[in-house]
Swiss-Prot record:
Record's subcellular location: Cellular thylakoid membrane
Family membership noted in the UniProt record: Belongs to the phycobiliprotein family.
Post-translational modifications: Contains one covalently linked phycocyanobilin chromophore.
Matches recorded under InterPro entries: Globin-like_sf (IPR009050), Phycobilisome_asu/bsu (IPR012128), Phycobilisome_asu/bsu_sf (IPR038719)
Function: Light-harvesting photosynthetic bile pigment-protein from the phycobiliprotein complex. Allophycocyanin has a maximum absorption at approximately 650 nanometers.
Protein keywords: Antenna complex, Bile pigment, Chromophore, Electron transport, Membrane, Methylation, Photosynthesis, Phycobilisome, Thylakoid, Transport
Residues reported in the UniProt entry to bind (2R,3E)-phycocyanobilin: 81
Annotated protein name in UniProt: Allophycocyanin alpha chain
GO cellular component: phycobilisome; plasma membrane-derived thylakoid membrane
Gene Ontology BP annotations: photosynthesis
Amino acid sequence: MSIVTKSIVNADAEARYLSPGELDRIKAFVTGGAARLRIAETLTGSRETIVKQAGDRLFQKRPDIVSPGGNAYGEEMTATCLRDMDYYLRLVTYGVVSGDVTPIEEIGLVGVREMYRSLGTPIEAVAQSVREMKEVASGLMSSDDAAEASAYFDFVIGKMS
């Protein structure tokens, strides 16, 4: 839920107008909209590059996952790993656009640790894949945009750690 929706829901629940503090938060949200959209456009437009480069970096740092017996061993399992990385990048994009981590958590992180544990997938490798995407994506943006996007990547990483 965006800051705008949250503020309206809270004010309406109390049958009141928006407070000056709520209006200030909404103003900051609206003012930052162009930057959030620019970041989302960069992530969306560069998603194949981000996922591929981050995947290559992950597999260099964690050769165990692409070796025989590893969770990403073989063409099909490597493709599955890259698909999952793309999914988390998409979630980060949702967070950036909304200016909130709620969509990330509600759409895709509930039960993620348990799911990977049940599949025998090392969750630390999944978290590392998100770190690698953060690094690659940050190199495609200004330092201000990278700092904004980093908060959402870090949220995903934190939920996996």
